[in-house]
């Protein structure tokens, strides 16, 4: 089961590569930007699919962490994004700001996650992150977790993606590679796919 990032969807690039390259069934479904609505969607999908592995990408990593009992791979984990959403939430109270954010972050064409930046939705991400991090190894989480973080990820500068944050909560269970936030295909094939096979065989 693949959980896409913000503005992604069922036709996102990485799960499409995985579906073509792997002998396993890869399922990626478009979910709500509202984390409370998405939580219910994820619970139903896990019950239906009974996945052997969950892969989270970027903001989707927080959803992945909340689904216990299944090994996980996190790609470009944006674990600190909710802290920025907290600040953005207050800005959306200014008339016109929500419309500006909606235009700036408008998803690509296709089956993509609709984005609507409202105070109510953005404020929910604080609780969402808190619940996700309860599953960390530091807090007693038992699920196998491995992350892939690109050293050229532009979100490292703002710490939205943070190697330090990841290691604080999950230890050294991560692979650093010379790639960007979007994880180029060569790294999907050379790093992520072997790890998927390793976890599923284990």
Predicted regions and their residues:
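Residue in the alpha/beta-hydrolase core beta-strand immediately N-terminal to the catalytic nucleophile
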Residues: 52-55, 71-73
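Gly/Ala-rich beta-loop-alpha elbow adjacent to hydrolase catalytic centers
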Residues: 55-65
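Generic recognition of short, well-ordered alpha-helical segments
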Residues: 13, 37-41, 67, 160, ...
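Short hydrophobic segments within beta-strands
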Residues: 2-6, 55, 148-150
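Active-site catalytic motif of lipid deacylating hydrolases and related acyltransferases
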Residues: 1-49
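Short loop/helix-cap segments at secondary-structure boundaries that form the rim of catalytic
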Residues: 19, 63-69
